[in-house]
Amino acid sequence: IGELWVAGPNITPGYWNRPDATASSVEGRWLKTGDAARADAEGFIYIVDRWKDMYISGGENVYPAEVENVLYQLPQIAEAAVIGVPNERWGEVGLAVLVLKPGQSLDRTAVMSYCAERLARFKVPNDIAIIEALPRNATGKVLKRELRKQFMGSQVPAIS
């Protein structure tokens, strides 16, 4: 898995009046998309996550979308977002931020057990937080940077 870079006549030469953003995302004729992608044996490219959302736990790359796809299989979960949070031993560990469907309940042990049966050990979230709604931008995209701000260095809210 690597970062997807693209080039062609339809690609922007850079960001308008933002030289720092251009310098970090444009290299020659190539635009760094910020997408984590893989190619199969036939050359088809699959986007697996956003590069900036990946975190490293114990030296292993964890792509939150993979963990979120497992979490969405739990019938109690309406929405899920996984972020990396600091950990003294592993560098970072996963925190699953969940929104439950109305009238549902879910405990940490059930989530951990479910994930442990379907994911490599280092991908299983270290903890969960249940909140009312995930922060989103105007187009509906989950704002993981807001979740990171909310949960960095603070105790995870009690699970109800």
Segments (PLM) and residue ranges:
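Acidic/polar alpha-helix N-cap and adjacent early helical turns
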Residues: 149-160
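AMP-binding/adenylate-forming catalytic core of the ANL superfamily
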Residues: 3, 8-9, 13-17, 21-24, ...
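FAD-site-proximal beta/loop scaffold in flavoenzymes
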Residues: 29
